[in-house]
């Protein structure tokens, strides 16, 4: 099968099962696997939207303990004997009584060959409706605070009527608003400089009153929780408290504490989050809920502070962190990581929305979001459409009018004896579950076959890594083609109020002892690039930047040495197969990307970029690693994809750059001059008017279903904003190189970075020399 046909097949599988594998044939031995260089891995999107897939309204049929694999199309079913043989552990299991009518021609949906992914609605209802606790920073400009208030009031109409809502505001003090008290506005105030224990918070809020700590009775899904829990004074159903919540929000004022000109406002973000988590964990442990933080500046007081209140003291930079010149960093990270452990244990999600040009301490707080599957939205101001539209998208609904968000999810991976799971890289925490599927080595969050994601959405994707169990030795006699299998079980609380289980079962052939060509052909360079990018980012969080770049280079050289065709020590003979040719290019752009190069980005920005990369599936991750560039000119109709190269900048062209985080329209020199001269408004220049509008229309389409909303930039050649484009282009025309062949075409880029051409020359030289 040629590469294009294979690509189509992999895309089809991705649409159906939400999975892409780095290798689609598995090596037979661990020795062979180590020579592949790129690990066996999968990018899996558990809740990938499949509008055509049925939702089964019964419990799944599972194998005996300890296996617990779910019945799937790869199971051997003996219809006459009413038994099925589990492909994972080979145990025989009886079919349940309600399968008595199945025949060769009438089989249940989960046994259909196309049902490699299937979803069950379980009988277990959620313990409470979804909870939304808003935590709002009042130390901000009047217009910013008003924008947050307006967005929150508007969001009440987007929530299910039975959803519970609460409000905490903070500045110098943190205030928990008692929404259930209707006589007047009433709130409980916590001192911003004090570190409260969970017990103190519960006592102060009256949540430990005798007799009120009994477990809440089970209620019907879709009904509001009975208001017996002590927390019901603070968290009320939207339909019941819409008026009070709107009233409290509209009356919110800026923090009254005076701020001197040479000081930052006193902001107790740490106390506010600690109180929010304490309130939720008392009455709603393991009930789906979101703590949504809206902040416009750094914590300057109390536990978790990231910078002092004096303006002459700058907030930490990457340079300070490298030199260990960090006064508050370690203490703040420890504080927020402890909160993250508590909140992920309780099953609640933390989202952080930022409206600030300055850093707010996202680097220190990242554990709260990354371990709970929350959202990070980084914008310059809450008044921007970027914030407003991103916030609305959190509450998107599906065709059945349910919120497209899952709560309290857990992912378990089962494998056949040939494979072992080594870890997961993504927004989750380990459930420390050991099984025969757990490998000896560790990649990412390892030593477990099960992870907890408090929040999960249709785009949430996870990198899952595997190793081969077989150490080698004489190959056993194999009957027919031999396959290795993996099964992904995702339990989650659906926003309709029931628990669901999504099951994806994957089988791939094992290579024969001499199956080198089959292995090479099965390489999916796009999935591999994303899986390697996740490992590089995981390493970058703990290792030095240069060490990570050396690791990326070393792995690339080894892969090319292993799979390219060449004569030893002859770089001109170097050739890569079609399914490897783009991989070096992806690695070139990855090592130049903001994920690994921190220069020119603040620690908060780096944290945000890495967070989003670890959330998205293959297609969007590749756009982040290697942005797309389209060109528009009067000579061609519509957009023409062009190389991400400085030679693509031409005076008579308009470029549209998509980096996922930014969408940029760049006008070449001549185009910009014509636009400034107003030709588009004159008669007879319809073509020019159309070509100015076309990239804007295409940009609108790109923005349509992206989260968080990208920043939209329109700039001209020579303008300051053009730096966003120039920093992404391959510098084939620099001040020192000139164009190829001595002729200068395209824009000169002032940089010491090597071009892709030079990078490939070095790569070929090292790959053919056999040195790593």
Swiss-Prot record:
Choose any GO biological process term that the UniProt entry carries and state it: COPII-coated vesicle cargo loading
Q: List the disulfide bonds.
A: none
Gene encoding the protein: SEC23
Compartment annotation: Cytoplasm; Cytoplasmic vesicle, COPII-coated vesicle membrane; Endoplasmic reticulum membrane; Golgi apparatus membrane
Membrane topology, as annotated, equals: Peripheral membrane protein
So where does Zn(2+) get bound? 63, 67, 86, 89
Q: Which domain of life is it from?
A: Eukaryota
Q: Which UniProt keywords apply?
A: Cytoplasm, Cytoplasmic vesicle, Endoplasmic reticulum, ER-Golgi transport, Golgi apparatus, Membrane, Metal-binding, Protein transport, Transport, Zinc
Q: What is this protein called?
A: Protein transport protein SEC23
The answer to whether keyword Kinase applies is: no
Q: What does this protein do?
A: Component of the coat protein complex II (COPII) which promotes the formation of transport vesicles from the endoplasmic reticulum (ER). The coat has two main functions, the physical deformation of the endoplasmic reticulum membrane into vesicles and the selection of cargo molecules.
């Amino acid at each position: 099968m040629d590469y294009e046909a294979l690509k189509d097949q992999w895309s089809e599988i991705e649409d159906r099962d939400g999975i892409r594998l780095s290798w689609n044939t598995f090596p037979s031995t661990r020795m062979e696997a180590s020579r592949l260089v790129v690990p066996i891995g999968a990018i899996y999107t558990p809740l990938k939207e499949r509008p055509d897939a049925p939702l089964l309204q019964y419990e799944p049929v599972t194998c005996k303990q300890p296996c617990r694999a779910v019945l799937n199309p790869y199971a051997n079913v003996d219809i006459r004997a009413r038994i099925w043989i589990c492909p994972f552990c080979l145990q025989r299991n009886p079919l349940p009584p309600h399968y008595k009518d199945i025949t060769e021609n009438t089989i249940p949906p989960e046994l259909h060959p196309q049902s490699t992914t299937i979803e069950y609605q379980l009988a277990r209802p959620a313990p409470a409706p979804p909870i939304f606790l808003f935590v709002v920073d009042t130390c901000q400009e009047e217009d910013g605070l008003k924008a947050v208030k307006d967005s929150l009031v508007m969001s009440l109409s987007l929530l299910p009527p039975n959803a519970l809502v609460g409000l905490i505001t903070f500045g110098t003090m943190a205030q928990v608003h008692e929404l259930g008290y209707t006589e007047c506005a009433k709130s409980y105030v916590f001192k911003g400089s004090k570190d409260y224990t969970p017990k103190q918070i519960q006592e102060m809020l009256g949540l430990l009153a005798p007799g009120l700590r009994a477990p809440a009775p089970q209620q019907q899904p879709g009904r509001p929780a009975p208001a017996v829990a002590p927390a019901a004074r603070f968290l009320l159903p939207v339909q019941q408290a819409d008026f009070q919540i709107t009233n409290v929000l509209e009356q919110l004022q800026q923090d009254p504490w005076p701020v001197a000109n040479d000081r930052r406002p006193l902001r107790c973000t740490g106390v506010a989050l600690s109180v929010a988590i304490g309130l939720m964990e008392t009455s709603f442990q393991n009930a789906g809920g979101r703590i949504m933080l809206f902040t416009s500046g750094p914590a300057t007081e109390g536990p978790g502070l990231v910078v002092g209140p004096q303006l002459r003291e700058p907030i930490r930079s990457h340079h300070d962190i490298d030199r260990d010149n960090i006064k508050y960093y370690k203490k703040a990270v420890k504080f927020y990581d402890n909160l993250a452990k508590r909140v992920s244990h309780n099953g609640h999600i933390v989202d952080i929305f930022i409206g600030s040009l300055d850093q707010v301490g996202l680097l220190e707080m990242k554990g709260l979001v990354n371990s709970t599957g929350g959202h990070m939205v980084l914008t310059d101001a809450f008044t921007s459409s970027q914030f407003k539209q991103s916030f609305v998208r959190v509450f998107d609904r599906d065709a059945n009018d349910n919120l497209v968000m899952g709560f309290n999810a857990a992912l378990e991976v089962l494998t056949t004896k040939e494979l072992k799971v080594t870890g997961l890289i993504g927004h989750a925490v380990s459930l420390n579950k050991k099984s025969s599927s757990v490998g000896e080595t560790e990649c990412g969050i390892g030593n477990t076959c099960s992870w907890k994601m408090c929040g999960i959405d249709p785009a949430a994707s996870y990198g899952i890594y595997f190793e081969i169990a077989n150490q080698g030795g004489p190959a056993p006699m194999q009957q027919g083609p031999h396959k290795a299998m993996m099964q992904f079980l995702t339990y989650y609380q659906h926003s309709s109020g029931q628990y669901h289980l999504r099951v994806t079962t994957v089988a791939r052939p094992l290579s024969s002892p001499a199956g080198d060509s089959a292995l090479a052909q099965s390489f999916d360079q796009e999935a591999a690039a994303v899986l390697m990018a996740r490992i590089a980012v995981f390493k970058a969080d703990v290792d030095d930047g240069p060490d990570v770049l050396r690791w990326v280079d070393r792995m690339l050289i080894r892969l090319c040495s292993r799979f390219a065709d060449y004569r030893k020590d002859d770089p001109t003979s170097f050739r890569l197969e079609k399914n490897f040719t783009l991989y070096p290019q992806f690695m070139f752009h990855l090592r130049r990307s903001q994920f690994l190069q921190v220069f020119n980005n603040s620690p908060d920005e780096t944290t945000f970029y890495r967070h989003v990369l670890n959330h998205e599936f293959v297609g969007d991750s590749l756009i982040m690693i290697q942005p797309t560039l389209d060109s528009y000119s009067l000579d061609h109709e519509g957009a023409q994809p062009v190389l991400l190269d400085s030679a693509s900048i031409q005076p008579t062209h308009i470029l549209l750059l998509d980096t996922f985080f930014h969408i940029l329209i760049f006008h070449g020199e001549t185009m910009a001059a014509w636009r400034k001269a107003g030709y588009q408004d004159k008669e007879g220049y319809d073509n020019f008017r159309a070509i100015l509008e076309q990239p804007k229309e295409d940009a609108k389409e790109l923005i349509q279903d992206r989260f968080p909303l990208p920043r939209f930039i329109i700039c001209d050649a020579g303008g300051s904003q053009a730096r966003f484009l120039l920093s992404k282009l391959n510098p084939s025309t620099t001040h020192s190189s000139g164009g190829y062949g001595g002729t200068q075409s395209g824009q000169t880029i002032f940089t010491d970075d090597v071009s892709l051409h030079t990078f490939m020359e070095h790569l070929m030289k090292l790959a053919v020399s056999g040195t790593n």
